[in-house]
Amino acid sequence: MSENNEIEMELPFDSSAITSTEVLDRVNALLTLQDTQNELTEQMEKEILEIEKKYLKKFQPLAEKRFEIVSGKVEPTKEDQQCKAPIQVENLKSVPTDKGIPKFWLHVLQNTEVKDIIEECDIEALEYLVDIKIVQVGDAQDYSLDFHFSENPFFTNTVISKTVKLEEDNELNEIVSTPINWKDGKNFTVQSKKKTVKSKPTKGKAATTTSTTVQEVVPCFFSTFVSPNQDPTSDEEADEIMYIQYQIIAKLKDIVIPEAVNFFLGRASDAEENDYDFGEDFEDEEGEDDDEEDDEEEQTIKKPSGKGKAQPQQPQDCKQQ
């Protein structure tokens, strides 16, 4: 007997509808059919994974050509422009100094549901985003989403990766993000905040007040998704953060990146019924401290409610640190 079957046998079940030994025998027969279906599903998923790997290799030259055109490394020929339904825009003027397609990926992201976590402070940095690539990691089903940036005033990274590591059964294991190497004074994902602490009076001593400066996370695309800099307070919260990250990565990988030009044009949609609202998953809680401390805001990612959404509060303004 397989380990999976042993686990299934240990699961509790409702026996109220099993009214006789004959019905029990029939239910066990259905469970046998279910075992076979599970085995076929597992086999199907493995074969689908192999097909995806095969076609990912075929897609790569197309993605590279797209990058060359977007970045301005090459100019498309007349033959390159023979699409099935070319678009026309009236009253455009020639600007020979224009290079590539400016802010292509910024416009792509702003036309997806990811826009809900893009703040004003993200926009200038995202203007330097020149490509998003899907990279298969070895022979495993692991893959990474690589964000490629041109030289910019914010950080020294040219590539920031989010690597998805999966178990053999395709279950999510972990997501590893590249740390961002911020340039001095350019980290807009944190802000300094003064906190006043008042001590309790003791015999012979009056209460004293001291001030200290703390670094607080500013919720935005870079701090909550690209390279999260929040420390989860529990294993449950860590799992929730990872799950939300995976939802965004999967949507970018499966829907947005393959259809990037249509998202750029605003004529594609990544919204699905009962979809997560990513902006609402990154919730800003406000709470009152006791008399020893002034009011302090804490940024957390909240667990979705039964409807698959957590209700947000307004995020604080983005400031550079």
Curated annotation (Swiss-Prot):
Region (Disordered): 272-321
Location in the cell: Nucleus
Disulphide-bridged cysteine pairs: none
SUPFAM superfamilies, A to Z: NAP-like
Start-end of Acidic residues biased regions: 272-298
Entry GO terms, CC: chromatin; cytoplasm; leading edge of lamellipodium; nucleus
Single GO biological process annotation from the record: nucleosome assembly
Gene3D superfamilies assigned: 1.20.5.1500, Nucleosome assembly protein (3.30.1120.90)
UniProt keyword Nucleus, yes or no: yes
Pfam families: NAP
GO MF term set: chromatin binding; histone binding
InterPro entries, sorted: NAP-like_sf, NAP_family
Role summary: May modulate chromatin structure by regulation of histone octamer formation.
The family this protein is said to belong to: Belongs to the nucleosome assembly protein (NAP) family.
Record-given protein name: Probable nucleosome assembly protein
Gene source species: Dictyostelium discoideum (Social amoeba)
